[in-house]
Amino acid sequence: MSQRIIQPSASDQQFPGKSDGYEYTVGPKQAITSEASTTYIPSRIYSESLLFKRQEASLSAMAFLFQEMISQLHRTCKTAGDFETKLSDYGHNIGIRLLELLNFRASVSPSSLPRASAFLSQNESSSKLSNASNSPGMLANSSTATSASANERLQEKQTESLSNYITKMRRRDLKILDILQFIHGTLWSYLFNHVSDDLVKSSERDNEYMIVDNFPTLTQFIPGENVSCEYFVCGIIKGFLFNAGFPCGVTAHRMPQGGHSQRTVYLIQFDRQVLDREGLRFG
């Protein structure tokens, strides 16, 4: 017959149900008060991303991360086609998110930027004050007073967002040329800190366009003429266009010219439905 183990100085009321161990997401129960558990701390992630700030990752860190992605795919993929497809899928997941971010960011008027910056700084100070008030090392009376005042300010900002400073959303791009110019300028500047070197329409097929980059940033440390590693950027372009309502296929081609040995052309082939839709809408 099994025997129940009774812990010293512990009653049944303290342990009403079965426990799997220490709850790391909550922490020690005696350190959490009912007031602290109900405190709402508004997230600044979305507001910060809407406000344009030059936040750059170091090239060495990005190159190291990209190298690890390539190494992992080389170990798991059996064919070059499988490698390019999976690498493109990685970029696709980024591209579908960049459309909304850049559209919202382009909709914040320049006159609202000073007020938006002030909003973020006030929101940050309120969050820090709330975190300090919930720390277990403070005295009980001062913690209660500080937490109450912090909660009042947080409740006021609970419904606020940087999106309130957007008075008019940027119009959605409906033409192929408009969305490609947005990629050529805004998207490329966001990703690589410069616009792409050229945007060309094919003279042979009406559904083919080309974006040219004379000096690809991510693959500049990868020697050789193999363009398989460029399919990460192909995936970003494809995901961006797919989320914008322009389904297509994107491939990469190495075409050296002049002194640019790594000059890469990203060939975009739109589905026939995109051309038919544009012909019906705009003639």
From Swiss-Prot:
<feature type="region of interest" description="Disordered">
    <location>
        <begin position="126"/>
        <end position="156"/>
    </location>
</feature>
<feature type="compositionally biased region" description="Polar residues">
    <location>
        <begin position="1"/>
        <end position="16"/>
    </location>
</feature>
<dbReference type="GO" id="GO:0005783">
    <property type="term" value="C:endoplasmic reticulum"/>
</dbReference>
<keyword id="KW-0256">Endoplasmic reticulum</keyword>
<dbReference type="Pfam" id="PF04051">
    <property type="entry name" value="TRAPP"/>
</dbReference>
<dbReference type="InterPro" id="IPR024096">
    <property type="entry name" value="NO_sig/Golgi_transp_ligand-bd"/>
</dbReference>
<comment type="function">
    <text>Component of the TRAPP I, TRAPP II and TRAPP III complexes which act as guanine nucleotide exchange factors (GEF) for YPT1. TRAPP I plays a key role in the late stages of endoplasmic reticulum to Golgi traffic. TRAPP II plays a role in intra-Golgi transport. TRAPP III plays a role in autophagosome formation.</text>
</comment>
<dbReference type="GO" id="GO:0006888">
    <property type="term" value="P:endoplasmic reticulum to Golgi vesicle-mediated transport"/>
</dbReference>
<dbReference type="GO" id="GO:1990070">
    <property type="term" value="C:TRAPPI protein complex"/>
</dbReference>
<keyword id="KW-0072">Autophagy</keyword>
<dbReference type="GO" id="GO:0016236">
    <property type="term" value="P:macroautophagy"/>
</dbReference>
<comment type="similarity">
    <text>Belongs to the TRAPP small subunits family. BET3 subfamily.</text>
</comment>
<feature type="region of interest" description="Disordered">
    <location>
        <begin position="1"/>
        <end position="20"/>
    </location>
</feature>
<comment type="subunit">
    <text>Part of the multisubunit TRAPP (transport protein particle) I complex composed of BET3, BET5, TRS20, TRS23, TRS31 and TRS33. Part of the multisubunit TRAPP (transport protein particle) II complex composed of BET3, BET5, TRS20, TRS23, TRS31, TRS33, TRS65, TRS85, TRS120 and TRS130. Part of the multisubunit TRAPP (transport protein particle) III complex composed of BET3, BET5, TRS20, TRS23, TRS31, TRS33 and TRS85.</text>
</comment>
<dbReference type="GO" id="GO:0005829">
    <property type="term" value="C:cytosol"/>
</dbReference>
<dbReference type="GO" id="GO:0000407">
    <property type="term" value="C:phagophore assembly site"/>
</dbReference>
<dbReference type="GO" id="GO:1990071">
    <property type="term" value="C:TRAPPII protein complex"/>
</dbReference>
<dbReference type="GO" id="GO:0006891">
    <property type="term" value="P:intra-Golgi vesicle-mediated transport"/>
</dbReference>
<keyword id="KW-0813">Transport</keyword>
<dbReference type="GO" id="GO:0042147">
    <property type="term" value="P:retrograde transport, endosome to Golgi"/>
</dbReference>
<keyword id="KW-0333">Golgi apparatus</keyword>
<dbReference type="InterPro" id="IPR016696">
    <property type="entry name" value="TRAPP-I_su5"/>
</dbReference>
<dbReference type="InterPro" id="IPR007194">
    <property type="entry name" value="TRAPP_component"/>
</dbReference>
<feature type="compositionally biased region" description="Low complexity">
    <location>
        <begin position="126"/>
        <end position="151"/>
    </location>
</feature>
<dbReference type="GO" id="GO:1990072">
    <property type="term" value="C:TRAPPIII protein complex"/>
</dbReference>
<protein>
    <recommendedName>
        <fullName>Trafficking protein particle complex subunit 31</fullName>
    </recommendedName>
</protein>
<keyword id="KW-0931">ER-Golgi transport</keyword>
